[in-house]
A protein has these predicted regions:
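C-terminal effector-binding regulatory domain of bacterial HTH transcription factors
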Residues: 1-2, 196-220
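Conserved amphipathic alpha-helical segments that form helical-bundle/coiled-coil interaction surfaces
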Residues: 102-169, 181-188, 197-208
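Short, flexible turn/loop "capping" segments at secondary-structure junctions
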Residues: 61-63, 137, 178-180
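Acidic/polar helix N-cap motif
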Residues: 74, 101, 193-194
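A short, hydrophobic/aromatic-rich structural module that often spans a beta strand
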Residues: 21, 25-26, 160-174
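Amphipathic alpha-helical interaction elements
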Residues: 52, 97, 145-149, 211
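Short linear motifs at protein or domain termini
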Residues: 1-98, 218-220
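Short helix-capping and inter-helix turn/linker motifs at the boundaries of alpha-helical repeat units
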Residues: 7, 176-177
């Protein structure tokens, strides 16, 4: 029974976090427990525990005597998150390349293929589901680092990546051929085990996405 409760709690945690990342729950939105029980079909005690955990992860603010609200956004926070992502993802990618094996390379090729299909379809205006596109983008970047052989590093990268992704969903513009080319170069240099070139492309990719996010936003 305890395991079942934990599973329900984890599932609800992921649903609420996803809604914050995707902008369904926008910055500074009040999170009223009674309303959330209907939306997420969870008890008040479970929701309170989940919101406290999300506060610890930086997605929610816990306000004394005022309850919970979605964390605010700012350019300062965005730049800090972007720099942290570069630091963490670069290190994890280096370790993944050092531990390179056939199974990981196959997963990487598969993740990139799915992302490339989505991006090419968007480029040719055959597809415009940006949520699915960013989920495939996330899968590719998570696969890049998963072979680092450090569970803590993978979890830390996922947390920072999700925070960065939240900002992208506030504007969510597609950079077209530039994004496609950067992902291809990142794949190629990684498979060639050329960390220095892969790291350079990764850093440029993140900073260009950052500039795009800042320029297109009037939210923060």
């Amino acid at each position: 029974m305890d395991d079942y409760i934990k599973t329900i709690g984890l599932s609800t945690y992921e649903k609420i976090k996803k809604d914050i990342i995707f902008g369904v729950l926008p910055p500074l939105k009040k999170l009223k427990l009674k309303e959330l029980t209907k939306t997420y079909n969870a008890s008040i005690s479970t929701l309170r525990e989940i919101l406290s955990r999300l506060a610890g992860d930086g997605f929610v603010l816990s306000q004394e005597q005022k309850g919970f609200c979605v964390s605010p956004v700012s350019k300062t926070d965005l730049y800090e998150i972007a720099n942290l992502r570069i630091l963490i993802e670069s290190h994890a990618l280096k370790k993944s390349i050092e531990n390179s094996n056939t199974e990981w390379e196959a997963e990487l090729l598969s993740a990139h293929y799915k992302l490339k299909v989505y991006e090419n379809n968007m480029l040719n205006e055959k597809f415009n589901n940006k949520n699915d596109w960013k989920e495939n983008d996330s899968e590719f970047h998570q696969t890049l680092v998963k072979n680092c052989r450090s569970e803590n590093l993978v979890k830390l990268h996922k947390l920072i990546f999700d925070k960065y992704l939240r900002y992208q969903f506030l504007v969510l513009t597609f950079r077209g051929e530039n994004s496609i080319l950067e992902h291809q170069k990142l794949l190629d240099f990684t498979l060639e085990k050329n960390y220095l070139k892969a790291q350079k492309v990764l850093e440029e990719h993140i900073y260009r996405g950052l500039d795009n996010t800042v320029l297109d936003s009037d939210t923060y």
